[in-house]
Structures are given as C-alpha cells and as structure tokens.
Amino acid sequence: MTTPTQQLSEAGVSIWLDDLSRGRLETGTLRKLIEEKNVVGVTTNPSIFHAAITAGTDYDATVAAQAAAGASVEETIFEITTTDVADACDLFAPVAAATKGVDGRVSIEVDPRLAWDTNGTIAEAKHLYKKVNKDNVLIKIPATIEGLEAITATLAEGISVNVTLIFSLERYRAVINAFQAGLEQAKENGHDLSKIHSVASFFVSRVDSEIDKRLDKIGTDEAKALKGKAGLANARLAYQVYEELFATERWALLAEAGALPQRPLWASTGVKDPAYPDTLYVTELVAPGVVNTMPEKTLDATFDHGVVTGDTVSGTYADANATLDALEKLGVSYNEVVALLESEGLDKFVASWKELLADVEGALASARKAS
C-alpha cells in the first residue's frame, strides 16, 4: 500500500525534516526516516540547534574537548553545528547523488545577528561552506533587505543557498530576482550553474497565527469565517509568483546555461491551532517542484493519516486573492502583518542564539573546572 509520504513524493513534493541533532544521527533515527518516511533533506535553524545542544549529554564530550583546547564559545558552537551538518550531509549523500543534487540537502544558517549586515553575512556564508565542505550543504540566509545582496553574492561564488524567513509576496519577488542575479554573476565567474541549488523558504503557519489573533479581536461571523485561510492563500499566491518569474526570457537564458529553478520551500508547517487538521499545511500545499520541511510531529501525522489528493495549489489563485482582499476590507493589514512576522522571526532566532551562547559558555566553564 502506498503511504501518504510516498504519494507526496509522487506528486512532486520533496519532504525534508525540520530538525537535526547528534542523537538523531548516532541512534539511526534520521536514517530510519529516510528509509521509511521518504525524507530527502534536513533544515536547521538557531532554535533547533539550541534545543539539541542543551538537551541531554550528546555534546558533553565535544564541549570538554573544546574546553581543553581553549576554544571560545563561538568556536565551540561552530564546531558542534558544522560537524552535525557535515555528518548529515554524508547520510544524505546517496539521495543527493540519485537526484543530481536537487535533494539530499542539509541547511545551516548564518549567525542570525548578521541578518542586517550584508558583508558579515557573505563572509559567514563562505566560512560555513568551507568548514562543512560538502557539496550537498545549503547555507541559510534570511531574506532581509540587507540579506538580498548577500544572497546574490553568495550564489555568485557557486555556493548553494536556502533563503529563509520569507513572509510577503513582494519580498519573495525580490528573493527570486536576487537568485537570478546571483546565477548571472556565477555564470560570468565561470561556475557550472547546474551545480548551484537554491530553495526559498516561505513561512506558512505563522501567518495564520498572527492574522487569526486579529480576526478574533474583530469577532464578526465574517472575520471568523476567514480564520485559518490566510497562510494557505499567501503560500498559494507565492507559487503563482514562482510560476510567473520562472517563465521569463531572463530565466530561459539561465536555464539554457544549465541553471535549475529556485524551488519554493514551505516552512513553518506545524499547525499551531489545535482546531485545524494537523496536516493542513502539507496536504493543502501540494504542487510540483516544491519542498515541504516538517517538524517530526507533522511528518508523523502526515505519514499516519494524511490525505493526498494531488495538486492543491494550481488554479487556486483567484480564491487566494479573494481571501487576502477580504482580510484587507476587514481592516487586517497584510503589509503590517508580514513586516511584524519578519521582525519577530529574526528576534526569535537571535534570542535562541544568545541563549545558546550563554548555555555553552556555562558548559565550557563547568568542563574547565572539572579538568
């Protein structure tokens, strides 16, 4: 019997796991997800690494070794995260080979404190890429205004990029433009475009969480009827943008030179509101050529009872536009919401990073005392 995750794969959706830890690597649980649940990639972020590193004892030996070597807290975190990502890249290498690098990808994010620093982001991206030293790594760069130029410059060096924290259609257009500009420069620099890969991580459930709060405050029947619809509408219109901007003459020239399109990646796909189906942001966002990165809870729910009915995105654009128009008429400002979500998203990652710095600093101090 075909499983729902197999059906997603057959419909053109690549399933990535939104989580990574040394425990997953050493116990074989990540390998099991590849073998049994069609997982073909991994994404990480500062919050994921904070949770992994501060839970249990998996990293104690590494911290002790770093303490003995006199490493700083930043050097220790860099060593831990890049080692985990490199090991995951090795695990996914057969997938990468089988898909010619399209899947089998593992993402690692630049220090989130650099989100507003173009040159700092470029330098960090190169440093991470060199340290991990795996062809199937993706360097995650936030889609801030300052990040757009860094995305172009990083791609121009032949480095594959995961653009993250995209909430608005306008910013998504700018991201695709930055991607195509990066490939144009990479071509001029003599890089093989067929070896440069990219995804654009478009966040879904957080849009509903914020807009639903505003709809609850309005409280009318019309407002309540729109709950749980904005995230899907926004993502579906993003796919329309993807179709539009990868059907241009500009893109045709790059494709002729061997370039592959930057795939939309649905992120923030765990359902926050228990009133909604737990597979909402998976089964309702099926379209050819997309990635869906899921926390394990969402992956398990999809595998267990997800109902995959084929493409649920193409042809939905009129309804999606109508949803966003109805929200504006009720006084829910799309531009205000997406700007807030970008700011909050960055703040959360910076906060997680600072907590991680403090926790690892404490662990290093304890290790030095013990020795």
Curated annotation (Swiss-Prot):
Which cysteine-cysteine pairs are annotated as disulfide bonds in the entry?
none
Which residues are catalytic?
K140 (schiff-base intermediate with substrate)
Decide whether keyword Transferase is in the record: yes
Q: What is its EC number?
A: 2.2.1.2
Keywords (alphabetical) are: Cytoplasm, Pentose shunt, Schiff base, Transferase
Q: In Gene Ontology terms, what is a biological process of this protein?
A: pentose-phosphate shunt
Which transformation does this protein catalyse, written as a reaction? Answer: D-sedoheptulose 7-phosphate + D-glyceraldehyde 3-phosphate = D-erythrose 4-phosphate + beta-D-fructose 6-phosphate
List the coiled-coil residues: none
Its pathway? Answer: Carbohydrate degradation; pentose phosphate pathway; D-glyceraldehyde 3-phosphate and beta-D-fructose 6-phosphate from D-ribose 5-phosphate and D-xylulose 5-phosphate (non-oxidative stage): step 2/3
Q: Supply the InterPro entries for this chain.
A: Aldolase_TIM, TAL/FSA, Transaldolase_2, Transaldolase_AS
What are its GO cellular component terms?
Answer: cytoplasm
Q: Which family does it belong to?
A: Belongs to the transaldolase family. Type 2 subfamily.
What is this protein's function?
Transaldolase is important for the balance of metabolites in the pentose-phosphate pathway.
NCBIfam families the UniProt entry points to? PRK03343.1, tal_mycobact
What is the name of this protein?
A: Transaldolase
Protein source organism: Pseudarthrobacter chlorophenolicus (strain ATCC 700700 / DSM 12829 / CIP 107037 / JCM 12360 / KCTC 9906 / NCIMB 13794 / A6)
